[in-house]
Amino acid sequence: MKLIVSVMPRSLEEAQALDATRYLDADIIEWRADYLPKEAILQVAPAIFEKFAGRELVFTLRTRSEGGEIDLSPEEYIHLIKEVAQLYQPDYIDFEYYSYKDVFEEMLDFPNLVLSYHNFQETPENMMEILSELTILNPKLVKVAVMAHTEQDVLDLMNYTRGFKTLNPEQEYVTISMGKVGKVSRITADVTGSSWSFASLDEVSAPGQISLASMKKIREILDEA
């Protein structure tokens, strides 16, 4: 599993002050641009992409409806994604499929989509349908993060992930059970068939995240012969 760490600057000054060397243990950097005012995102972008030049990077605009910090109309959402994609060619672009399904057709030319679904309230009963619909669209990655309230919620998502990965071995998945009870899902990625696990450096970007240092140690232990 690859370890992903998010950067969440709230201003150009914070972006410029980021110390990229602190993120060397991360395999991929996620830029959570939703922590900025929408009019500042394109102004801050050069600093982020220069700071992490040569690193794999995910561009993410996590909207409030899916647990993020920004509200965007479909037109604003698509415009910002397309501008960043065309100017900086991030390795991955997160797209909130269920929040912006009506404009998804405008993203069909982008081969590096992470089609995502986030539910900070529950693990919905229709998880299989969600995973199936996202898988059929054949994105670079399918990402699902849902809140776990019981151990069964966690086991269900792990089992669904393993099943879908077995049936679709070429498709990459990232599935996460959020919250304290869901922490175990963050360290079992290799078993369930999830490609990434999100870790934290200073500030968590989702409930239940484990520190990068701890995740690195856990991965080393799991990789031992």
From Swiss-Prot:
Name of the coding gene: aroD
Protein name, UniProt field: 3-dehydroquinate dehydratase
The keyword Amino-acid biosynthesis belongs to this UniProt entry's keyword annotation: yes
Keywords: Amino-acid biosynthesis, Aromatic amino acid biosynthesis, Lyase, Schiff base
Family indicated by similarity: Belongs to the type-I 3-dehydroquinase family.
Catalyzed reactions: 3-dehydroquinate = 3-dehydroshikimate + H2O
Source lineage: Bacteria, Bacillati, Bacillota, Bacilli, Lactobacillales
Quaternary structure and partners: Homodimer.
Catalytic residues (UniProt): H118 (proton donor/acceptor), K143 (schiff-base intermediate with substrate)
